[in-house]
Every structure is written in structure tokens, then in C-alpha cells.
Amino acid sequence: MTAQSNITPESIVGDLRYLQLLSRSFPTIADASTEIINLEAILNLPKGTEHFLTDIHGEYEAFQHVLKNASGAVKRKVNEIFGNTLREAEKKELCTLIYYPEEKIQLVKAREKDLDDWYLITLNQLVKVCQNVSSKYTRSKVRKSLPAEFSYIIQELLHETSVEPNKHAYINVIISTIISTKRADDFIIAMCNLIQRLTIDSLHIVGDIYDRGPGAHIIMDTLCNYHNFDIQWGNHDILWMGAASGNDSCIANVIRMSMRYGNLGTLEDGYGINLLPLATFAMDTYADDPCTIFMPKMNFADTNYNEKTLRLITQMHKAITIIQFKLEAEIIDRRPEFGMSNRKLLEKIDFERGVFVYEGKEYALRDTNFPTVDPADPYRLTDEERELVEKIHYSFMNSEKLKKHMRCLFTYGGMYLVSNSNLLYHASVPLNEDGSFKHVKIRGKEYWGRKLLDKADQLIRTAYFDEEGEDDKEFAMDYIWYMWCGPEAPLFDKDKMATFERYFLEDKEIQKEKKGYYYTLRNREDICDQILDEFGALGPHSHIINGHVPVKTIQGEQPMKANGKLFVIDGGFSKAYQPETGIAGYTLVYHSHGMQLVQHEPFQSRQKAIEEGLDIKSTNFVLEFNSQRMMVKDTDKGKELVTQIQDLKKLLVAYRIGLIKEKV
């Protein structure tokens, strides 16, 4: 008995208004039947390949390369298709062309004597690769991915076989005509971009696009134009969202971070933030101060600065750091419920003796020059500092590019995501020592587990979108800063952020940040199951996917925790963490055959990738192998399609029994 025969007239009467609306899209029995056939066919295709990346931290070249080579999938497919029929050097050339078509074509033109012959060979090779990567999709989906100007021609090439002599001649004529009409360059570029697009069906960024590295704005440009992606906000992303919302403490933090790593590109080139007022203030205020402890970490910088510029960045770094401490104290005083009064540390300095006094113990200060700090009122901004804060605030609030990128972060992002039974969030779900969910009080009401992350998500959106001057907006603006460094914030979940201690004190013990219980308890399978149940991520193949804490692979730490229930995939995209991790990042890949982790070696440079064919060396580890290939019907999208099919079957019954008339 079919599902349709179970649909009775009585069962569809309640849905009649909806079915009448549906009939506008499918006005006849033939239309509805055709759509049912199409959707049933889609359900039985293999699921698309999902890629999970986290903690990119502005490393745009490595990030873009991983997207272009699909974490090694393109190279693997080229090897599968051409095997021993191409030499290794030829396969490497083809892969480089697929990754960087515009640049590679120019190099080929400079060296190739018979360009038309190269075009002919290359176009045939690209057609084979394209046929392979498009084979798991419907023709309709592939068609929607095609560039308009070449849509018809690419469809002809993809869906015709060259085995039959007539078809072989037909394909050759198409390719020859592309070459003779001088369209080969554009066509090759279109084919390469299509291969890149079809190899990754969906992309999940599990937080921390921003800070440390040089090109977060370039990563955001790439994402804003990407075909299918989502973002789970990280603590560094939240900091920039707070800055874009107008929180001056967040603004000071993002500037300080840029100075610390010597990467000003995102601020100045990306968002047009005017740092001249800060430079002028810093030069005047710290003219005779060596500011030694504020020297940027130049081994991670995007530019080789001359001595004069380096000196200026060092002064600016100190200036904005002191301003940050003052601005944060204003929030701490305004929000005693945050319980962060112990982070007001300027008042604990004995300025006369140059020591820091904390809990009865004295610590020598590494820097004792505080020209803008009044010992009697250490958190009061000087008139010059207040004016500077206003100027920088104006610059952040009027950056159109920043607004565009923040809208993208809000539209495609959130605190967490449940996708195909996987639960994605950047850092933590706060827990008590016994493993129960920690109850966190926000404005007098307690939240925990999923409700806590939902509330945080709502407050972050309120901070950015709500009307100025509203009480809810003011609280949300302060809370977005708390999300960055608050002890009970799910994106931080440590007892303190020891920024002051790391700058000013030598003692390593006082610099330690004690992690919340989540970070140890997540190694237990029962705890992970409890969290998965809380968020409705059900099924035998459900997992938690985290970033935030770098996996110290070099020390033997494994990214897989809790008997395979949880994956931590921060492998060190950020160059600052590569000495700790020993590698340069992970990609988690979830395809129809199962899950695998791709471990990346450091990326040399885009230039070397183009000129020398240097790919990222990646190692694959199978984490989970499906005994039966996973189909679209097994995914979240499949569940949606099943519901659509059921509705269309109801519409068919409504047509056939006369409840709705066909519109022939």
C-alpha cells in the first residue's frame, strides 16, 4: 500500500488553505507528480560533502587554499581519474590550474609554444574532473551552479559521453570552437571554479575568523560570496561584533590584538579604520618610553616594518592597552552582577614602589611608566584619551565594509548549530563539577544548557540591532563584552582573562587561566551524550564539534574525545599556535561514506603554490566509516524533502477528488 493511499479526504481538509497555496506552484496533476518524482530521486542521491573548519584567525592564504583544494579532495579525485595515464608532474599542474586558474594560465602562456594544443588537452581533462565531481548531484543543482554565459555549453559537455563516435566528434567540435573563438581562458576559469564549488557542498566555520592573522577581512569577503556556509561564533568573532555594535571596550581590545601581532591590515586596509589619532596620541604620550613589553610579536606579522614604524606600533600598543583597562573598569562598575570586580587591577598597583599587590602578595612590575593613570582615580580617562576613544568609535561605526561583514556574520551565524545530527559550537556549554549544566543568572533569571546559548545569541543580536538608548540595548552592549572574557560566558568559560598579568608580571602562576569544568568533563562519553540530548542532536552518529582550544598534536594529544563523541578541530591555522600544535590546522570532512579528519602541514604561500605547484601536505584519518552509504534521505535536508513529498501527495489527492481544481 502506498503512502498516498493512506491519505484520506478527511485528513487533507485541515490543510486545504495551505494546499491551495501550494497549487499555485504546481497547478496540475502532472506538475505535482513530476515534482514528487524529482524529489524522490534526490532522496536517493549520496549526501553532499560537508567541510568543518575552525580557528582560522585571519590566515587567509591557508584558508583560501584549503577551500580551493577541498582539503586534498581535488588532488585525490585527479589521481583517481587519471591514475597512471598522467605523470605526477602533469597531475600536479592540473591541480594547480584548478586551484588558481587565472594565475596559472598566465604562467602557461609565458612558457607554452603550442597554446592551442595545451587548451585542447586541458579542456578535455577538466571535463573529466567536472563530470566526476558533479556525479552525485542532480542536473538541476549543477545547472544552478553554472556561470550564465557558459551554462549551456558546460551542460552539454558534462552530460554527453564521448564513447559513441558521433558524440565524440560533437564534443571535439565544442572544445575546438571554444579555442578558436578565443574563449578558452574564460571557459577554463569557469570550469575550475565549478570544480571547486561542487567538491564542497557545504562549509561550516566553527568560530574565530578574526584576530592574530593578517586577513580576516579577506576571509569574510570569501565567505560572503560562498555558495553554502554557516558560522558558529567564536570569542574573537564576538569581540569584533561588539566593536561593530559600538562597545568601546571591544574596540580597544581588537585594536590591542592587532598591535600585539603586528597585523594592521584588517583594521586599516580592510575596514578603513583611522588609526592616525591613536598614533599621534601614542607618540606624544610615550615619546620617551621604550615600551619594551609592548613590542609586537613580529614573527607572526604580515609586514616587515622598519624600525621607526615598529617603534610607533609599540607605543600605540601600550596606549590602547591602558585605555582598554580603563574602559573595562567602567563596565565592571556598571554591571556588578557580572562578578568581575577582581579584574580591576590598576588600583592594585603601588605606583610609588612600582609593585603590584594582589591578595597580600607583591609582584614586581615589568613596566612602571603610567603617565595617563592617576593613582587617586586610576580608571578615569584623561581628556585626550576620551577624545581619542570618541574618534576611534566614530571610525568603527562608519565603516561600510565592517557593517557588510557583520551583517554576514549575523545572517549566517549563531551560537550553535545542529546539522545532520552533529552539534557545532565553538567553545563550551558551562558545566558544574558533577557534570550538571551550570545555571547562569542573566538579569535576575537563570539559564543553562541550550537555553543559555539561546539567550546569549539573542543578547548579541540585541546589542547590534536594537534601538540606541534602550535599556535592553545598553545591557546587551555590556554583555557582548562579557561574552569575550566573562567567567560564565559559554565562549570563554575560564576564571579570568589574564591580559594585565601577561603584560606586566613575570610570575607564570598568576598568569594561569583556570578553565571551566567543561574542558575536562567533555572527555566523558556520558557527558557528551547529555549535551547532545539537550540540543536535540540525536542518533547513533551524533557528535559534538568544537574549536577554541588548540590540540597539542606535537605532544600526542588526539582531536577525538569521549570515545568518538566529540571532535576538537583547532589544529593551528593560526601561526601563533603552530609551535604548540605541531601542525597547521584540521579539516573535518563528512561525506556519504563517513567522517574523516584531514591534518594539514603549514602552507608556504599562494605564490609558491602557483609557481611551484606546492600544495598543502595533508594526512587523512578515517574517524567513522558508514557500512551503508549515507543518502540525502538520511540528512536534515532529506527530512524536509520527505515533508514536501507528503504535502504534494496530499495535493494530488485533493486534485483527484475535486477539492481543488487543476489550473490547466
Curated annotation (Swiss-Prot):
Its EC number is 3.1.3.11. Disulfide bonds: none annotated. It is an enzyme of class 3 (hydrolase). It holds the Pfam family FBPase_2. GO terms for biological process: gluconeogenesis. It catalyses: beta-D-fructose 1,6-bisphosphate + H2O = beta-D-fructose 6-phosphate + phosphate. Keywords: Carbohydrate metabolism, Hydrolase, Manganese. Pathway: Carbohydrate biosynthesis; gluconeogenesis. Its cofactor is Mn(2+). One of its GO terms (molecular function) is fructose 1,6-bisphosphate 1-phosphatase activity. It comes from the Bacteria. InterPro entries: FBPtase_class3 (IPR009164), Metallo-depent_PP-like (IPR029052). Belongs to the FBPase class 3 family. This is Fructose-1,6-bisphosphatase class 3. It comes from Bacteroides thetaiotaomicron (strain ATCC 29148 / DSM 2079 / JCM 5827 / CCUG 10774 / NCTC 10582 / VPI-5482 / E50).
